[in-house]
């Protein structure tokens, strides 16, 4: 029986060339990159080389690149960094259909005194961009909306959302 995998929003296999490049780190170069010994230092150098390559591709500085271990950590780092950089702003916008990790972070932020706006979706899973526009305020620190819903597969109009958010001078995370 042949299988068709339709849940690539949740997890995706790595490209063969990525797998090949990672084999040494699964078999020989598995030291702790933070260790002071040579074994760890070799891994640390590989991570720094990767950071520099990513920075070059993005037109950024290597010290601006942060590697995380998973999507949950990535989302939390992005949102928390935005809030720490703008302590005077206490409002966050996201959707009711975000990944559970972001919903949990939102609940945590509400307990810490932040105000969250959770945008709804229609019966087809689409966002109302007028609702987003109305929700943005002077104290909005960040808008965090996933590119595509991991349960329904609905793709959100990220380019349009990014333009709307940028016009208002608000940080955007997707």
Task: Identify the residue ranges that each predicted region occupies.
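Pyridoxal 5′-phosphate
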Residues: 1-174
């Amino acid at each position: 029986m042949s299988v068709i995998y339709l849940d690539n929003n949740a997890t995706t296999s790595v490209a063969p060339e990525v797998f090949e490049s990672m084999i040494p780190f699964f078999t020989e170069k598995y030291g702790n990159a933070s260790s002071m010994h040579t074994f760890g230092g070799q891994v640390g150098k590989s991570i720094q080389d990767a950071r520099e390559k990513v920075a070059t591709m993005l037109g950024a500085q290597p010290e601006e690149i942060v590697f995380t271990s998973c999507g949950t950590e990535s989302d939390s780092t992005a949102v928390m960094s935005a809030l720490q950089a703008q302590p005077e702003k206490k409002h966050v916008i996201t959707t009711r259909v975000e990944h559970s990790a972001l919903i949990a972070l939102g609940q945590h932020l509400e307990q810490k005194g932040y105000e969250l706006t959770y945008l709804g979706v229609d019966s087809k899973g689409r966002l109302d961009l007028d609702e987003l526009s109305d929700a943005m305020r002077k104290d909005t620190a960040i808008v965090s909306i996933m590119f595509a819903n991991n349960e329904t597969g609905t793709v959100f109009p990220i380019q349009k959302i990014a333009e709307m958010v940028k016009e208002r001078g608000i940080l955007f995370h997707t």
